[in-house]
Amino acid sequence: MDIWCPEKKYLRYTNGFNVSELEDVCFKYNYQFPKVGYCRVPNYAWCRNQGSFCATFTLYGKSKHYDNYFGIITGFTAFSNSLEEAVNKLVFLAVDFITWRSQSLNVYG
């Protein structure tokens, strides 16, 4: 099977489903405004058995000086057979990671 990953030029973006929860968490912990993208997974892709829809999101952090420099922290990808389920799964994973990261960083600093 061919290697496949979602490409930006084929993504559509949404703020529906549960994305507002992700927006709130990103604002609370000072991350860049989230853009959740989704696309259909092609039949030939290795990950097709995970689901026919793919949702993706890249988490960017802001610098302390607010000089519009955004660095990539991590990326998330979720698969499911329905678009709503894929986006909801992605939002759940991202919110969980952001809250875990904030708690872990507060322990050390």
From Swiss-Prot:
Pfam families registered for this protein in UniProt: Corona_NS12-7 (PF04753)
Family of this protein: Belongs to the coronaviruses ns12.7 protein family.
Protein name: Non-structural protein of 12.7 kDa
